[in-house]
Amino acid sequence: MTISSAILLGIVQGVAEFLPISSSGHLAILQNLFDLSAGEDHMFFDVLLHLGTLISICVCYWGDIVAMVREVFIVLRGGRRADGTLVQGNLGAARLFMMIVVGTLPLFLVLPINDKVEELYYITPFIGVALLLTGCMLFVSDKMTPGTRTERNMRFRDALVVGLCQCVATIPGLSRSGTTITAGIATGLDRRFAMKYSFLLSLPAVLGANLLSFIKAIGEETVDASLIPAYLLGMLAAMLSGIAAISLMKLIAKKSKFGWFAYYCWGAGILTIILSLIF
């Protein structure tokens, strides 16, 4: 693992995690077709890359995260300050927190088959087909009429539908952000809120996946200390490119142009299938 390859993988992770083009699919393609990976320490490096994108979300949605954490502490204190006086809560933040919890619950369905899902990362033609499906989904999403629901009137069933779609998007090549944003729009969410909910919903998913990967990495891998600088630079690249990608997505959401990415996914999917047959 060289510094340049670590930075490249970090940029790919940060950009593809938030643009609806599938970060898992792109990283798998780079590894399978071009042998560009972290080598024996790949699991530890993956943890750092996802940590970088997690920081990106925290930076871009810091206000929402602080508001939700504040609401949790208000509830734990029975709605009162330390001196016993009542606190005026933030209904939107409280409901958003509940919807993230509900949307995260379906991920437990994936745990028993997680090893089977990971095997798909090594089937390059399958990833190409999944990218084609992602393109179709994004194309359709732009044809949908978005609703008006936000955190204040989002329903529990909306959160469950988006959460179930997030489970499906664990398949490499299917974009998590694209799948969950499209699902949110389909259930009647406002387009910009659907994007915000999608990104915030990834926080517990990334934290949980990172925790499992970290425990597994500690038990199975010995990290090469000489590669730590490259890994940290890769994480920094993932964080910075992630912030840029989220900012771009906010602009695109205003113009309702997620379908632009459909053409990229179709091209990437076709190219992936062709290259997998050649190599």
For each predicted feature, which ranges?
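Multi-pass membrane proteins that catalyze or facilitate reactions on polyprenyl-/lipid-phosphate substrates
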Residues: 1-279
